[in-house]
């Protein structure tokens, strides 16, 4: 059994959340021992979503209107998958994404449809806007007010610059269970001050999340760029012919070529793991059967990345 989780990638400041990543690994590991791969993914991602330091669930970034629109997806190695985009007032979007996979014939539900689906299944209303999120919004609005133009124009002019320097705190988990089955899941609050209705890579299978018989992947970073490159699927398919780490490095090289800030975690069906970023630093942790406890690597940018 193997589990690896991530808490986002940043070119600048990253949250000190290694304790949460370790707890996510342990929660996922417990589920793996009792159930199957998809349960390990869901339980691990729920821990990450519940931490206000990370941009998912309770810590999700508000959009331009001050509303929190969240997205998530989950996928198994038999191509079963489900996702939600633009969902509001839900504590754990990853659980709704799993419900889409298991209880509908659809792959992706968005906006009001996703909200209605969640309520019909009994998911309780939950306000994910915590004190930390409010402070983040206040800082962004105050900075925008100092500009000569409107906040809308400010967003349009500064969005790409902001993307390159901010913490892109998508969270995700990838697992291999005791029966050799793989699964992956990704959850996010999107980009701080994004336009209402914007959807990134996280809920899109093949872009932010991917799993098949050879490997599984979860992405983080600049969603638009990840979508254009279809990175999760590429990395997943490359694992048929190389190690998980080699596949991730190949994906990051492609991202660098096109100027896309991103990171990835991956698990191959032989139990090998891979993680890396195109630039900046991605926070992650992993746990394998031959380890005493989860490890949260303290790698910094440009350090040597040997095969794992």
Question: Can you say where each PLM-predicted feature lies in the sequence?
Answer:
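Alpha/propeptide regions of enzymes that mature by internal proteolysis
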Residues: 1-308
């Amino acid at each position: 059994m193997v589990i690896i989780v991530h808490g986002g990638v940043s070119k600048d400041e990253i949250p000190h959340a290694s304790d949460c990543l370790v707890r996510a690994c342990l929660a996922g590991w417990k589920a793996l021992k009792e159930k199957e791969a998809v349960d390990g993914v869901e339980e691990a991602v729920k821990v990450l979503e519940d931490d206000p330091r990370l941009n998912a669930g309770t810590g999700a970034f508000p959009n331009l209107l001050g509303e929190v629109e969240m997205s998530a997806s989950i996928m198994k190695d038999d191509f079963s998958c489900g996702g939600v985009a633009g969902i509001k007032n839900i504590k754990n979007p990853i659980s709704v994404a799993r419900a889409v996979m298991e209880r509908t014939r659809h792959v992706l539900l968005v906006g009001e449809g996703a909200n209605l689906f969640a309520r019909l299944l009994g998911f309780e209303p939950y306000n994910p806007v915590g004190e930390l999120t409010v402070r983040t919004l206040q800082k962004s609005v105050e900075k925008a007010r100092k500009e000569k133009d409107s906040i809308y124009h400010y967003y349009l002019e500064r969005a790409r610059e902001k993307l390159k320097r901010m913490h892109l705190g998508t969270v995700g988990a990838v697992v291999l269970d005791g029966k050799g089955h793989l699964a992956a899941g990704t959850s996010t609050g999107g980009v701080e001050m994004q336009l209402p209705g914007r959807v990134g890579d996280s809920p899109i299978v093949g872009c932010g999340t991917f799993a098949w018989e050879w490997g599984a992947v979860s992405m983080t970073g600049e969603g638009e760029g990840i979508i254009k490159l279809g990175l999760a699927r590429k990395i997943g398919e490359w694992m048929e012919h190389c190690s998980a780490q080699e596949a991730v490095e190949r994906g990051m090289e492609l991202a660098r070529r096109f100027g896309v800030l991103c990171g990835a975690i991956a698990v191959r069906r032989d139990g090998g793991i891979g993680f890396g970023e195109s630039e900046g630093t991605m926070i992650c942790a992993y746990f394998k059967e031959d380890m005493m406890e989860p490890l949260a690597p303290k790698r910094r940018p440009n350090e040597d990345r040997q095969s794992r």
